[in-house]
Amino acid sequence: RRVNAIYYTPDTGDHRTLARGVPLQAGVVPSCREAHDHLLLVHGVTALNWGRRKWGVLPRLENSDLTMANPPTPDRWRLWLRHAPRIAGRPDWAFVKLHTHGAPAPNCDMLLGPQMRNFRHFIQNQSVPVHFVTAREMVNVLHAVEDGSGDFATPMLDHHYGPPPCM
């Protein structure tokens, strides 16, 4: 099984194909990149979180969600960085993909309030550069790395797929 990975896999409708595929590599454009029968999969971090235990015994499962029950914290940040998918040839780049399930109203206070502001302040003071991007922009960055781009730059955000017409 693949966990915490970035790779291309055939789109056959069979869930077992998700367990195999072609890993993304810096400077290498696989033939399946433009194939309509392949998907580019970017996993969110999945890991055992031994710092947060259920009933004080069992580790909780980290699944990269941001909710009131699972707000961003410095401990989760360190876990995300430790287990984040990386690209072969660019191990210094970690892709921490988080999700909010459409930001339902019960999570608004966490997403827009002091918890998120404190977290953003925390990560700004770390030695790791952080870029907040959309899914489209992340795919563009991945394709730019495949095409041999070096350090992160804003033009990478529109490298392969341009912004929608309304932007």
Segments predicted by a language model, with ranges:
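C-terminal domain-boundary segment and adjacent tail
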Residues: 27, 63-167
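Active-site-adjacent pocket scaffolds in enzyme catalytic domains
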Residues: 1-92
